[in-house]
Structure formats: structure tokens, C-alpha cells
Amino acid sequence: MAMPRKLKNLNLFNDGNSYLGLVKSLTLPALGRKMEAYRGGGMNGPVKADLGFSDDGIQFEWMTGGLDLISLRQFGAVSANSVALRFSGPYQQDDTNEVSNVEVVVRGRHENIEMGDAQPGEDTEHSMTTTCSYYKLTVDGEEIIEIDLLNFVEKVNGVDMLEKHRTAMGI
């Protein structure tokens, strides 16, 4: 029997700026597929056809303590990949003491910034939702998943899932 790898700490970088001590929490992006049921003649039931990435897109939610001027200055960025965020965290397996370095890199722009409640003498925090056009998950230096929505790239476990599609489209 083995113990699971658990996140022991984390850091976030915003365009190369370390948020060590500033980042309070984050929600790593959910990855989803757009699937549509199909049932044709001779089929005893529906099978879902994969129609690409989910219409929900890639969302990165995160929270900082205090006033975050870097993010506020990035709000309204024109380019769909204006903001670069990098999560880095050690996941430790307590029975073996092994530590895995997990890194998630995203590029996008802030869809929402909530400045939270403001009360004298009380903690303040900002909550950000960054909608992403790029996502890459790396574990111990190995690229597990890379998704580049703007450049039609989707790699999973080293396999370029869209290579044949790009070739067929002449790109």
C-alpha cells in the first residue's frame, strides 16, 4: 500500500514576479472535452464523439493577500496570451519521502478581479479569474499535457494529438 502525493506548499509567479508570501490559494484549471452523443444504425447505444476542447475553456482562479498592483495593471490586456502565470509546488509522498515538482504554466488574460471587502483593521484580498489560451503541466521535468488553443496544439504524454489534423489542414 502507498500513500498519495500531497501538495506541501506552493508559489505563483505572475510574469516572472514571485508571489511567495502573497498568494493565498489557487484553483488549478479543470481540463474538459466537448463530447456529443452519437447513435447510428446498428449501434445498440450512443457513443460520445470527441469534438475538441470544452466550450468552458481553461480557467485559472487564484487569490492574493493585500493590494495586488501587478494584476490590476494587467486588467484589460488586449492579447489573449498577455499574462503569464506559473504555479510551482512540491507534492510529497509521506511513506517514501519522495517529492515531485509539479509546475503548471498558463498564458491568458484576467477575466475577473474581485477586490473583496474593505474594512479598517481587517485582512484584504484579491481574487482573480484568468481565462487561458495556453496550458502546460510538467511533473519532475516531464511534460504531461500541453494545450495551446491559439496554435492548435494539444500534446498528452508526449503524443501530439492534433498533428494529423494540422497536416490535413495544411498548417
Model-derived regions, located:
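Mixed-charge, glycine-accented linear interaction segment located at domain edges/termini
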Residues: 109-171
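A mid-sequence interfacial segment
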Residues: 36-44, 93-132
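Short amphipathic beta-strand/extended segments with alternating polar/hydrophobic composition
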Residues: 19-25, 98-108, 146-149
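A short, compositionally biased
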Residues: 3-8, 82-86, 131-133
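A generic structural micro-feature
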Residues: 52-54, 77-81, 100, 120-124
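A structural detector for beta-sheet-dominated domains
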Residues: 13-15, 29, 63-65, 88-90, ...
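Solvent-exposed edge beta-strands and adjacent loop segments
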Residues: 1-69, 109-118, 159-168
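A contiguous binding-surface segment within folded domains or other stable secondary-structure elements
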Residues: 59-111
